[in-house]
Amino acid sequence: SVLGGFLLSNERREKQALREQPRELSQKLGQAIDGIASTSPLTVVDVGAQSLEDEDHVYAPMLAHTKGRVIGFEPLEHRRREREANERNIDLSLRPTLIGDGRSYTFHINNIDATSSLLPFNRDIVDDLNDHRTLETVATETVVTTTLDEAISDVSRVDFLKLDIQGFAYPALANAASVLSRTLVVHCEVEFLPFYLGQALFSDVDPLLRANGFRFVDFSRLSRSAFRSGPPASRDQLGWAEAVYFKEADTITNPSWILIQAFIAVTIYGKLSLARHLIGEYDRRSGTSYESLFDD
């Protein structure tokens, strides 16, 4: 119908505007942040920092719009060398440190590098799922972990903390109270099934981060698998996700930190209403009028 076509056309225009506005806002907010000496450069801490073949680093858009640096932790040497060779254009410091709770563990190096972990596979779970049953450990070594509080004690503010450490996020976060107190956004892989023996699940990580002053915002990615009996296209089991947390604004005393959160909300996640909400709080505290950018 004519009305249906009109409504569909409006919907398309709105969606197009939503796609375009984050790019413009990212540029303007990035310039604003670069102009505040106390906030620039922004700091990304990447725990589990190897590059993945099929995707960019989640924080790449952030580094494209403002000055930033990356402090990464990646235990596999060939993965560190690979990333250093491919990303010479950014301020990147990669360290071999294994982040954890400060104790000794057996590091399980698996046939798929990205699944290597301080914990062994839980074969009862892994063998049941079509996408996971070929995973296996090919080597082990004894290692000593370091807490985040120890590893980055000299970093005054963490703007974006990303963790992808295969079942070990909870111990890493539980021993990072000082770092979390000065972190603005956490992007963390969480599991809903125990792929690794002894691992904590999302239901454990969520209250830990809330207790440290963070609000759960969204899952930026959800991964589902089919059971091995098939059919493979029937991905019926939710296995893991990437969870996004923002430090509650009422716990932040420095207004510029809220401006950084707004920049991350729009630049990495495309969350315009969240960004505008945060900008409104920043304007209220700082006497600025950045919220007007959303009306352009």
Predicted regions mapped to residue ranges:
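Long, low-complexity intrinsically disordered regions enriched in Ser/Thr/Asp/Glu with frequent Gly/Pro
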Residues: 1-4
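Phosphate/nucleotide-binding beta-alpha loop and adjacent structural elements of enzyme active sites
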Residues: 6, 10-296
